[in-house]
Amino acid sequence: MASSNGGIVGVDNPPVAQPAVITTFNSSGTLTTAPYTTTAQYVIVAGGGAGGANGNGSGGGGAGGYRASVPGEASGGGASAESLASVSGATGYPIVVGAGGAGTTSDGARGSVSSFNSVVSTGGGGGSFVGPEKPGGSGGGASYSTSGGSGTSGQGFNGGASKYNGGSNNGGGGGGGASEVGTSCPTPALPQRGYPGGDGVASSITGSSVTRAGGGGSCGRFENAVIGAGGAGGGAAGANPVSSTANAGTANTGGGGGGEDGANGTGTGGAGGSGVVIIKEPDAGYRVSGVWDMNALYDNVKAGTWV
């Protein structure tokens, strides 16, 4: 029997439109989806790794892992966009935004993870002071003739290798970025020279193109060393040894921190930049009057409210 809602059979069901919704999280929180959302695009960037220090050519910090599901764009490590996240409408989802790794007087600390709906981006690897490479979302740059840290598949690239020839001919490797490997010190090493971090990945999920997850630059040895540039996307440049603290990665980009030479033994590597999580709920279209899903039909018939 037709009800009084314009001749439509069933419970009152007014038309509704749900436009696209974009939410940016610069710190951890909760995403509450719009009522008719069923899928979501995302860009999830972890915290960047800190640069190394006092290593006679310390490595730059690796960028935080970069994962994205924006159609037509890239994820990190040369991967294509991931599948859209499946979500439910009017539901809360925890968002974790990773902190950047802290700068120290030796190996840079690794960045922290960022996550949404079981999608986790790995923190960037710290830049090396001495010894083994530091893996991460993107790997940290090396120091003292070691290979750069390895990046995580689908998130970022390796850090650059270093070379130690004694004297001033030492150079750390640049931190890996989301779109390219950190630059390695050549053999033989050039005098007093640092090397750039790898570039990050650009996304237009917010409507404007922004590059994130660049690796930190390394440094050479001694006061006149040429510093390595930070990778595009928040990576910090390496520091000259006369600076007591190296440059930090840009906040909310997951950029790696810069390496600090520390010929005086007291320097501190640059901190990694914090991460970011961006969620886009696509336009859900126009829900017309007189259309119900099967759950609504069942619930109303069971309750005796279907007319």
Task: Walk through the language-model features, giving the residues of each.
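Low-complexity, glycine/proline-biased repetitive segments and flexible coils/loops
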Residues: 2-30, 36-294
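Intrinsically disordered, compositionally biased repeat/linker segments
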Residues: 1, 294-307
